[in-house]
Amino acid sequence: SDVYKRQPLAVLKNAFNYAKENNKSVHFLGLVSDGGVHSHSSHLKYLIKTASDFGLKKLFVHAFTDGRDVDPKSGSKQISDLINYIKDYPAKLSSLCGRYYAMDRDKRWERTKKAYDLIVSGIGNKSTDVVKSIEQSYENGITDEFIEPIIIHNNDNLKSSLINNEDVVIFFNFRTDRGRQLTEVLSQYDLEEPSMSKMKLKFLTMTSYND
């Protein structure tokens, strides 16, 4: 695809250079889907490849499953494809949840908080085989959009795979509306109820999420 031949934007270079110089993690957030409405998985792959080309070694993906713009049970294949792709790079799938939680746009903050707590505090169902966990959700009548937060558990330090202050965060959704709430509580302001606190992050988005 031509997407892999494009030169990274200056703002992306600056973020990757910052991460490299300060030994910080880079986190990729977004809808892992080939639906092309809010995001496209090819963009995530390009970002991972580019970060690796910069010599970055601490790359983490926080995946949101679709189920609305594509087949409601296509997430297992999408995630399996992503896992196979990142085997060639210093990247790991850290967490996963349905877009119902991560991409709410109607101020239902209790949903956003479940995604926030997952990627910041590691609160979710533990899994050592996330594709199997997704398929178990299907068996229980839960499709991609509604998959409960999952933290991918392995032998590595859990905290390092979560979003920490001073890290780089790249939200790769390119449509404005459904990335807004999670971006706001991660990087712009504190919310009292339910409690979510903004963090000190180098936060990048694919477009402006503000009105």
Predicted regions and their residues:
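Short, small-residue-biased leader/transition segments that mark boundaries at the very start
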Residues: 2-4
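Short coil/turn connectors at secondary-structure junctions
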Residues: 21-26, 55-59, 89-91, 165-167, ...
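Active-site histidine-anchored catalytic micro-motif
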Residues: 22-50, 54-81
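Beta-strand elements within well-structured catalytic alpha/beta cores of enzymes
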Residues: 25-34, 60-62, 115, 168-175, ...
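Short connector loops at secondary-structure junctions
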Residues: 63-70, 97-103, 201-211
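Long, well-ordered, tryptophan-enriched scaffold segments
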Residues: 70, 74-157, 162-164, 177-182, ...
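A cross-family signal for N-terminal binding/gating loops and helix N-caps
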Residues: 168-169, 174-176, 182-184, 196-211
